[in-house]
Curated annotation (Swiss-Prot):
Main location (coarse class): secreted
InterPro entries reported for this sequence: Coagulation_fac-like_Gla_dom (IPR017857), EGF-like_Ca-bd_dom (IPR001881), EGF-like_dom (IPR000742), EGF-type_Asp/Asn_hydroxyl_site (IPR000152), EGF_Ca-bd_CS (IPR018097), GLA-like_dom_SF (IPR035972), GLA_domain (IPR000294), Pept_S1A_FX (IPR012224)
Gene transcribed to yield this protein: F7
Keywords: Blood coagulation, Calcium, Cleavage on pair of basic residues, Disulfide bond, EGF-like domain, Gamma-carboxyglutamic acid, Glycoprotein, Hemostasis, Hydrolase, Protease, Repeat, Secreted, Serine protease, Signal, Zymogen
Function: Initiates the extrinsic pathway of blood coagulation. Serine protease that circulates in the blood in a zymogen form. Factor VII is converted to factor VIIa by factor Xa, factor XIIa, factor IXa, or thrombin by minor proteolysis. In the presence of tissue factor and calcium ions, factor VIIa then converts factor X to factor Xa by limited proteolysis. Factor VIIa also converts factor IX to factor IXa in the presence of tissue factor and calcium.
The organism's taxonomic lineage, starting at the top: Eukaryota, Metazoa, Chordata, Craniata, Vertebrata
Native species: Bos taurus (Bovine)
Modified residues (4-carboxyglutamate): 46-47, 54, 56, 59-60, 65-66, 69, 74-75
Protein name: Coagulation factor VII
Catalytic reaction annotation: Selective cleavage of Arg-|-Ile bond in factor X to form factor Xa
Site feature Important for S-92 for O-xylosylation, where: 93
Assembly behavior: Heterodimer of a light chain and a heavy chain linked by a disulfide bond.
Amino acid sequence: MLSQAWALALLCFLLSLWGSLPAVFLPQEQALSILHRPRRANGFLEELLPGSLERECREELCSFEEAHEIFRNEERTRQFWVSYNDGDQCASSPCQNGGSCEDQLRSYICFCPDGFEGRNCETDKQSQLICANDNGGCEQYCGADPGAGRFCWCHEGYALQADGVSCAPTVEYPCGKIPVLEKRNGSKPQGRIVGGHVCPKGECPWQAMLKLNGALLCGGTLVGPAWVVSAAHCFERLRSRGNLTAVLGEHDLSRVEGPEQERRVAQIIVPKQYVPGQTDHDVALLQLAQPVALGDHVAPLCLPDPDFADQTLAFVRFSAVSGWGQLLERGVTARKLMVVLVPRLLTQDCLQQSRQRPGGPVVTDNMFCAGYSDGSKDACKGDSGGPHATRFRGTWFLTGVVSWGEGCAAAGHFGIYTRVSRYTAWLRQLMGHPPSRQGFFQVPLLP
């Protein structure tokens, strides 16, 4: 009888629940509107159980501290937390060309294999290896081949090395090197004529001094054992070539030091287009009657390839100008060889300066400007014809010839230099095939 009463009570209880079951389930639209997983506090029994990633962070929302309790390792916890809290930024495989991805907070980092670079390793370094980009990485000259891409090559007297970019001398005294410094395992370029410093003995080994009847006439640059480049205007009033000599290895004019070598000038060659009294095409090539002996204090300056000069050397900020010219406007001539570093100006700034001097000399494409607007450092009378030398990756090149200027280091005015790259082909042709006799020659420029 008692068992029947219990059975009846249980049946009544189940029937009462049946009526309330529909309230447990929500309509679809209401269910979708609350698909949000709230964070809830762990119950008493859950706190007694060891940490579970699935229970703590998948079924619920966990904190960094709760995740740390699970991993019990700071680094592993942070790796998990970045992915858990921010999503895996590497899930889309953003790194290209075999790069590996590391997830970061709201970002990622690609570690690129050799030969690739960029945010997503998308850039093939080889495709960026062009002459217009840092000279193609070449130490001296850079060329382009449509099939093989860029290639490096070297000036005469140098050989390309196994790395395909470096140039090593093949002769004892190559152009563009300073022997006394090379033997000291290198040195800093000369520090910053007017406002300049004495060029230490042997550190301007290509500097030539041109003398007329034993007196300083102009400067010049040794570009080969028997060849000196200078300025055409130096020889406008020359009456007799027989009294003109070139001295190499000179340093202190007040005494004989030993390295000096004096040679008679056999030929003076200027462009046929040069007009006396004008400033355009102000360049001259001199052949010595006998070659000088190259050595520690006498070495040539490199005559650069024109493209290299215009596309690479022209963008080197500072270059060296040297000579024995006047130390000040209307001042005394320097006793020791002076050198100064001058900055090169942009062409438009040079042309603007030219337009501000109505009736003055015109700056043409065959020239460039260099110097300081405050007039603190400059070339001066007696420096004419001397070198504007530019250093690139350890080798010096002839980029300009001291031509003209308004005063010496005059404020607001810059020095004007003949742009050697415009005459490289003409100079090389004459050095390879000089006139057959001695004298003064006017030779047309190459078309």
